[in-house]
Amino acid sequence: VHAGISGNWCVKNKIAGSLAMVIEKNEEFTLGDFKITPFEVPHDSFDNVGYKIEAEGVTFCLMTDVGIVTDEMKPFISAADYLVIEANHDPEMLRNGNYPQHLQDRILGPRGHLSNRDCGIAIAENASPLLKHVWLCHLSDENNHPELAKKTVEQVLASYGILAGVDFQVDVLKRKVPTGVFDLVP
């Protein structure tokens, strides 16, 4: 149980103490062969975290519900062999869509969600030569679509001299369908 929700009455009463382990941000813990480091991601809900997971010489990083990529988050991207990162929206689709102004402002704010472009910039400015695969996730149903997210991220990468499919693979995770199984090799 993440420390931020350990105080939640429902969580306390539904998980036996012997089955729960409170985890803290930026404190590595182990689970079997996995070394896991939770790290803070800025979002307007309570106490969000991303995860760096290491096992058998592979580093996997997951970050979603990300308003902006902070300096504290950048080393986690840089360490990743495999990265799952939010590409939530296209700002033009958001501004021209049906969301009320206050919700648009929330999504576009520093504790909202990453746009496709900002996702691409975060990858381009922080990825290491070790990066093998990026999966774009948490796409908005109303303000994005998979082809646009991938195209925008790949265009941003290209503007930095990074070629998707050559330097590393970029794919989009489906919103409501389980993915296949991926073999994460060192």
Residue ranges with predicted function:
Residues 71-170:
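Cap/insert and terminal regions of metallo-dependent hydrolase folds
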Residues 24-82, 177, 181-186:
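Core dinuclear metal-dependent hydrolase active-site scaffold
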Residues 1-28:
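Active-site HxH/HxHxD metal-binding segment of metal-dependent hydrolases
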Residues 6, 11-12, 48, 72-73, ...:
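Short glycine-/acidic-enriched loop or helix-start segments at secondary-structure transitions
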Residues 1, 43, 69, 141-142:
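Glycine-/small-residue-rich active-site loops that bind phosphorylated ligands and cofactors
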Residues 20-21, 36, 170:
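Generic structural signal for residues in well-ordered beta-strands
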Residues 1-5, 61-64, 84-86, 134-137, ...:
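Active-site neighborhood of phospho(di)ester-bond hydrolases with catalytic His/Asp-centered motifs
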Residues 167-179:
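Short, flexible loop segments at boundaries between secondary-structure elements
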